[in-house]
Amino acid sequence: MENAAIYFQDVEKSFGTLSVLKGISGQINRGEVVSIIGPSGCGKSTLLRCFNRLEQINGGQLLVDGMDLAKPNLTRKQLLGLRAKVGMVFQQCNLFPHMTVLDNLTLAPRKVLNQAPKESSHMARSYLEKVGLGEKADANPDQLSGGQKQRVAIARALCMEPDILLFDEPTSALDPELVGEVLMVMKQLAEEGMTMVVVTHEMQFAKEVGDRVFFLNQGKVEEQGNAREVLTSPRSDRLRTFLSRMSGTLV
């Protein structure tokens, strides 16, 4: 637990009478890339959203970047501090359509971190260069492709200089030919040592870039371990079936 960026023990989450997470336990270490996979409705996105308190757990223990997220009454200041250190990239990019790309990137650093406009602008431009979109600073989101929007969303998250990045199916809404450009940026971040938790259906990415993988099924962790080993030689019948449907071939 000493090197844990995220530690969770017996985590439960329900929506009304629907139990979504049923006693999930695990740990994500600093510098790791961990993929969370599983069929629709298994709870993977809900678990991810618990990691930056977009959802509050109903039971169990959850420590993220040293903060106890099982506490029911975190202050607004505590939540803002958490979300500054635990960035999130959503399936839908959620860029503000009436603002330029640059303004989308500088808004949170100015409002939350109290950065000066010049400082936030310089940082935003450097991260746009990092994701290969330096020339798009003055563009509006509707002038970008889906892949470009998602890369801007990643740059926006990086502008908060997070310790942890959460990705909720970042490529699932993209045309297949645009997926690669987003995964390339994510791979670069992984190589630089960013702690990343990725809910994904991109099994090749999970196998090649991920250190470990959690396979969720019906609200529980059915299998976990080294990403390449788990995805190449799954132990459970359910995971074998899932992978065969994802890849189109029998495993």
Identify what each model region corresponds to.
Residues 2-227:
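ABC family nucleotide-binding domain
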Residues 216-218, 224, 228-251:
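C-terminal boundary and immediately downstream tail of ABC-type ATPase nucleotide-binding domains
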